């Protein structure tokens, strides 16, 4: 029992001794505390100065940098835009006008052909035989007519001496007229047979592009069979629509006596495909869409347009003379409507409420609220307030600042990696 108590007493002494030595080891000395206090006292004025200086730098406000451009006065073309579909000027499904065996095809699929060019041939022999028969019948009846006319002349001479009765003379005259009618009928039969023979040669009704053939050589064709589709692409048309509110503008342009120019652009309105002119306008408005159809014609000599192709149409209907234009980037939208920031000679900005018109390229027509020759802010607009002074950057300076701003994160990232390593 006494041994156990002694053992616990010894352990307690060891713990107390360890705690004492630990306290002595980690406790700072008085000289260190004094030095630290002295250093703090000497450093405080400089640190406070630095804080005041840093605070002063954060409190200072530099003029925000902006880019500016001059408004100007110019003549601006006025375009109407619409979505159009290319249509062939003429389209025909070619049939055979006679029935028979298809003997030959004289075109290549997709080929451009001229008006009257031979496309295909039907077996002509049955029609040649029919023509010969008709010509033979005509020759026979013509001979009978000649003989009847000669007999009529004799009867007329004999009737003067009463050797031929009047009835015989009348009968002969009637026979001559009968043969004359027969000859006319035979002439019609010959012409019909000749026409059937001509129809065995199928030709192009106009200049155009041949489509895919729809029947092969050797087949028996009739007038109901489709041989091919021919489309006229030189020239070619585009059908497009404009809102009914623009009808008066289009009519005014048509009445000017000058062709109304029309441009066809690709789907993205990035590349012009062809230039043409307005051809006609429909005679009624589509009540479901509130638009009216117009047709424009293009020469299309380079085959830039193809039937059923979708294109964007720009039609020049007027030219606005001496209007004020400003960069579209400078025009903003707010509660009061469109506005623009204008710079005075002291590089101070003021907000002008404006009325905008049509947009032409990167410029917009300003019909009210801005004069030609005024400087307007095009970049840095989000930091502006009424009457604030700004720093107007030259284009080169603006580009360099933009480049520096873009490179700064990369520089900071490299520096951070260097410190980290």
From Swiss-Prot:
Residue span of region Disordered: 34-69, 395-421
Extent of the signal sequence: 1-22
GO biological process: response to toxic substance
Keywords, sorted A to Z: Cell inner membrane, Cell membrane, Membrane, Signal, Transport
Keyword Signal: yes
Annotated Gene Ontology cellular component terms: efflux pump complex; plasma membrane
Biased amino acid composition, Low complexity: 46-60
Comp. bias regions, Basic and acidic residues: 408-421
PANTHER family: MULTIDRUG RESISTANCE PROTEIN MDTA
Subunit structure: Part of a tripartite efflux system composed of MdtA, MdtB and MdtC.
NCBIfam families: PRK11556.1 (NF008589), RND_mfp (TIGR01730)
Family according to the record: Belongs to the membrane fusion protein (MFP) (TC 8.A.1) family.
HAMAP family: MdtA
Protein name per Swiss-Prot or TrEMBL: Multidrug resistance protein MdtA
Organism: Dickeya zeae (strain Ech586)
